[in-house]
Amino acid sequence: MANVSIHPAVDGGVVHGSTEGFAGGTLQCLCASNKVTVDVASQSAHNHACGCSKCWKPEGAKFSVVAVAPRDKVTVTAHPEKLKIVDESATIQRHACTGCGVHLYGRIENKDHAFYGLDFIHTELSQQSGWSPPGFAAFVSSIIETGTPPDQMDGVRARLTELGLTPYDCLSPALMDALSTNVARHKGLLH
């Protein structure tokens, strides 16, 4: 299954280096100069390969690799004027560089959303090592929407499994539980 390319950051195997004591780093867009930079003063969490059609993916990748960090730990530190929200109607407001198109971070503004307070980040845009490694794959079937033939899906899922990235056609069970818990709390069923 090694011939199925997922994403450059995981195609050679998921690296499980030391994350102990890692306190974050800086993300940079791909422009040659006047780079947008975003400081993330926190370790990432829930890092995963995402097959949705909205996340930024490097050229040729079927999946993005995306994680979350606390919103209050994510700060644009250079060239904020180059950032534009990709789709203002989307739940996740993805802030992309107008120069190179890279998504620097995604933010949820709906305070009632289960993931409010978490910003979505692409740790591959950082020179620092120590970020949490990808641990699963989400929205796997969605890669069909971006052109992957359905008859290749068994191979894609097998490759994800081979890489240790359990494939889900939604989010991981822990994240789905968080979404459902949030709904139940808003209904007054849980406290």
From Swiss-Prot:
Catalytic activity: S-(hydroxymethyl)glutathione = glutathione + formaldehyde
Gene Ontology terms, MF aspect: S-(hydroxymethyl)glutathione synthase activity; zinc ion binding
Statement: the UniProt record of this protein carries the keyword Transport: no
Binding site for Zn(2+) 2: C50, C52, C55
Pfam families: GFA
UniProt KW keywords: Lyase, Metal-binding, Zinc
UniProt xrefs under NCBIfam families: formald_GSH, PRK05417.1
PANTHER family listed in its UniProt record: CENP-V_GFA DOMAIN-CONTAINING PROTEIN-RELATED, GFA DOMAIN-CONTAINING PROTEIN
Classification via HAMAP family: Formald_GSH (MF_00723)
Role description: Catalyzes the condensation of formaldehyde and glutathione to S-hydroxymethylglutathione.
This protein's name: Glutathione-dependent formaldehyde-activating enzyme
Highest classification ranks of the organism: Bacteria, Pseudomonadati, Pseudomonadota, Gammaproteobacteria, Lysobacterales
